[in-house]
Amino acid sequence: MANEFYALISRMRYITRWGLMRNSFSEKVQEHSHMAAVLAHGLALIRRDILGLPGPDPDRCAAAGLYHDASEILTGDLPTPVKYFNPEIKKAYKQVERVSGDKLLSMLPEALQPSYEHLIQEDDPETLPIVKAADKLSAYIKCVEELKAGNQEFESAARQTMQAMEAMGRPELDYFLREFLPAFSLNLDQLE
């Protein structure tokens, strides 16, 4: 059998997020994963270099961000309201994600599987909190961009996502929200 892992990973570009929402512009899982990786790397650097707190390696956080939604290649993107509708559905979906992750890992040569396991299965206790924060932050940035484009459909999602981020109690995330997030509301001319 051919090693199909990377061919499947490349298909993240076809999976659309926010499927239940009217979007001004679509966002694919690949785009979201890239932004989550950038943000996870940045949050880990803020934690270490600005706040002086211990934490995971920023490069490991970036890699984990790239693969955090890889299981969606096989499952598709299940909308958040469905995914978290009740504890039973949440638990069942976690199991589906685990099985999908196992399937992806099986498509790698055995020698590579241990290096990818924590990235695909999101079970590294060091990087997971940073990646979860980056994932929420990426979702919030999408909401900001949609609201900036006049799409009020994202108003509730923005509010709920901000509340979830504030509840995380992550100082590096709080720093980012205070110091970097306001720039996402600017237009191109204002950014220069």
What are these regions (language model features)?
Residues M1-E192:
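Alpha-helical, largely C-terminal catalytic domains
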